[in-house]
Structures are given as structure tokens and as C-alpha cells.
Amino acid sequence: VGPDGGRIAIGRSRNDHIAAVLRLALRDKVLDIIHKVLEIRKVLIDKAVEYKDKVFPFYTHAQVAQCGSAAQYFLTYEQIFTDIYAMLVHSLDYLNKNPLGSGAATGSIVQLNLDEISKELCLSAEILPPYYATGSRLFLIYVLFILSMAMLEIGRFVEDMMLLVNALKHGVEVAKHHISTSSIMPHKRNLVTLEIARAKTSKVLGALSALMSIYKSVPYGYNLDFQEMNYIAFESIKDIEETLEIIKDFIATLELKEEVVKEYLKDKPCWSSDLIEYIATISGKPIRELYAELAKVLQKYLVGDISSLKEFLTRYSIGEEEVQSLYKIKPFEKSLDQAINHALNRLQENLKEVKRVNEGLKRCNEMLIRNYR
């Protein structure tokens, strides 16, 4: 542009520019991840519908605790990702703040039209303290903190799947492209994609720790330490995006074999709490008394004395098959259809919300390009 190009720099600093560009880049990445989260939620709802009538083991203290519909498991993770979605949407409020005009630290004497600039960039026109606008990276750490929480939950899901695949053997069928064989042991089937997801979870948590460790030691104002934070953050986001794709496909291709699951649960009294609650409600007996009574029966039952349990059930006029299906009378189990429909309706509303955000950003981009051609 020649010598006149020297005028472009007035009222501008790399510090407020990079703070703005970083917000815009993060906003794009967050929206990409939001789309992936919505896709995972749809897959989880589909699985809840598919396995609504199939029994599934639920654990506490790494032991089978209770039984329930497999839909409950998938709806649990759908709720988790719904919460993550809400957090990510909330993070957009921080990313939409406009630091332009803040100069290097305390602002510029040049009066910028913040309303116009903000409108063109789809940013808020809220006036920020310049020192905060250029010297804070809380918005960056906040986004990575939310994404780290998502990875925490993914890490737990990975552990769940590894435990279930080993416990249920062929009860959980995993797609072949998620499995690798051993180079020397022909019997091995390794869940390699989940192992990678587990490693990436640890990487992201380590990266968050690195970001906070760098940030805590930086005196206020812009410092080049921030540049190192950017690299760490965007490498983590790449890992997160890849992991979300792995998990989505893993869940979508997962199959449960009901007969194998039932066989696995045969010698595990996951119905014990349901049974004493049921007897307490129909007999009026104190539940602690029933707890002690059934505990003694189960001590014998678990070492092979089946007759002790039969006598207990006969005493309260309960059939063996009835015991296995007691979980179905729980309020949540009886309202599974309603819970699934609620999750689906909520997802559809969230999809509309994101569509509106994307359409708004598209209009801003078109206006920006049109104005500066």
C-alpha cells in the first residue's frame, strides 16, 4: 500500500489484535466441538432407544451393584454431554468480548467505533478495561477447563468399556476397526482406539496444568509467555476433536448381547436392594430387619446354597423370575420413554440454538467481506 500504509497502525497494537484474533479462533473451535458434542448426544439417544428393554449391570466400588435398563447407561452419558454443551455455550459469552482499541496495555488515544467493529465481528460492544482486555487469558483457560472436564468423563467411559469388555467377554461387541491383534499372542484383542483416547485424556489434563502453571507466574499485562500458551491450547483442542470422533464412532458401532449379559448376572444378586425395598413396601416390615435377614441368606447363596434363597422368597410369596425383573418397577425405569423423548427434544432445541449462532456469524462474515472488498 506504500507509505500511506504506515497510517494503518494508529490506534492499534499487536496485543489487542492477538487478544481479538485468539477469541475469534477459539470461538470457531468451540463451535466445531459443540457440533461434535451434539452428534455424540444423538448417538447416545439412539443407543438408549435400541437397548431400552435390555438389562445391564451398574457398578459401585468396581462391583455389580444394581441392574437396570441399558438405556439408563446411555442416558447418563447423554446428560453428561448435555452439561458439557451448556458450559461450552456459556464460554461463548467470554469469547465474544471485544478487546480491540485496548492498545498495548491502557488503551489508545484514538477513538475507535467499537459498536461498528463489534457488529462486523459478531462481538459484544461491552467496554472492557484495556489492561484486562490485553493482559487476561482467563477465557482461554476457561475453554480448556471445560474441554478437560469433557475429557475426564471420556476417560471414565473408556475405563468402563475396558472393564465391561473383559467382564462380559462377548456381551459387548466392539467394531473391528477399534480393535487390534497382538503381534505374538493370537488370543488377544486390544481396544487400541480407546487406549489412544485414554492417553489423549491424560495429555489434555497435563496441558491444562501447564497452561495454569505458565499463567500463574506471568505479571499482569501482555507477555510472550502467552504465545506458548496458545500453542499448548490448540494442540490440546486438536487432541480433543480427534478423541470425540473416536468415542462417537465407538458408541455408534457398539452392540450389546442380552443373553451373554444375563448369563454374566446369573450369580450376581444385583436385585438385592430392590428385593428388600419391595418386601418392605408390601409387608410393612422395617427395611433394616429385611436387610439383615437377606444378608444372611446371601452369604449361603453365594457359596452355592440355592435353597436358602428359595426359602426366603417362598416366605414372602415372591417368584424367582419376579425377582429378576423388580428393577422395572422403579419410577425412572417406568418413565424411560419420557426420559428418552425429553433428551431428544432437548437435543433438537440445542441444534436450533447452534444453528442460530452459526447463521449470525455467517451474516457477520459476509458483511465484513462486503465492506472491505
Describe each PLM feature range.
Residues 17, 21-24, 28, 68, ...:
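Generic amphipathic alpha-helical segments used as scaffolds and interaction surfaces in large
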Residues 1-97, 101, 107, 112-116, ...:
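A helix-coil-helix interface module used to build multimeric assemblies
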